[in-house]
Amino acid sequence: MKKLLGIVVLGLLLCSNSFAGKMAVKKTIKLPKDIVQGYKNKWNFSCTWTENGKCMTPDYAYQIVNETDGHPVRFGKQSIRIELRKGDCHQRRKGSYNDCKASPPSERHEFGMEYDDVSPIRGITWHTYSLYLPKDTPQINSEWITMGQFHNLDYNKPPINLDLSGKHFYLVTRLLCIHPKKLNKRCYSTEPGNTREKILDSEELFGQWNDFIFNAKWSSKEGFFKMWVNGKLLYHFVGRTVVPKDGTMFKFGIYRGKVYSGDGEGTHIVYYDEIRYAKKSCKKLKLEDLGYSCSDLENQTVSRIDKIK
């Protein structure tokens, strides 16, 4: 009898585990104001089409978590925990793009601004997000591991990625790929004219929050893009920042090249918080919450402004 009772109790504990089972995420998601501010649109989340017509994702994929439960939080009381495991692919509807069958194949759990809405990311904008990678984050041999990107609505080469590589964090640009001389042609992030710049070393990256602030003018002619990391201006680009007649969307989560069988469990976990957006004015971001001053940020310069020659 005691053995049977033990089995029943264990079963109840497993069923109550918040990271067990699957959830349908075909509908858009409204994220809490404690975490996301300024974005008027709702969000979609990567999922996998099933034969019964639902788009499903494991419920460990993302969780709204609380500081009171021991989770890291940058400001306020909550953050978003995202987990990606080996084989987690995205295909939003039958016959659409499939991560698993792509060339090269990929895996993702990623939030994106609702794709069917008119993008608010036009003209001059300001953005922030804060990212926390646990100290025990594994080194995974993946072709790329993206944790935040500014992506075109239609064109398939995102101009700005932030990537984990080994124990370091990099800014990766494909601004050359949207330049008139390379538009609609084969173009890789490794080509001269694009940028791959290390922005955080391992001792700065793991087990602590890192803040990213962006200011851009999204233009198919003379735009600009600036990035601050933990309050320091590290990158400034001047030139085309968006494809003509296209728009820009922000995506965050984990998007990576396929992890193969010889690379352990292949599990990544990352926390996001303070995802903020404002048009034109830095002051609307309320960066004092995070310990920054708009006037201090805007007065900073870099030794070299990046341009496409």
Name what the model sees in each region.
Residues 21-309:
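Low-complexity, Ser/Thr/Pro/Gly-rich disordered linker/stalk regions
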Residues 1-4:
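Positively charged n-region of N-terminal signal peptides that target proteins for export
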Residues 7-15:
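Bacterial N-terminal signal peptides
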Residues 16-20:
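Sec/Tat signal peptide C-region and signal peptidase I cleavage site
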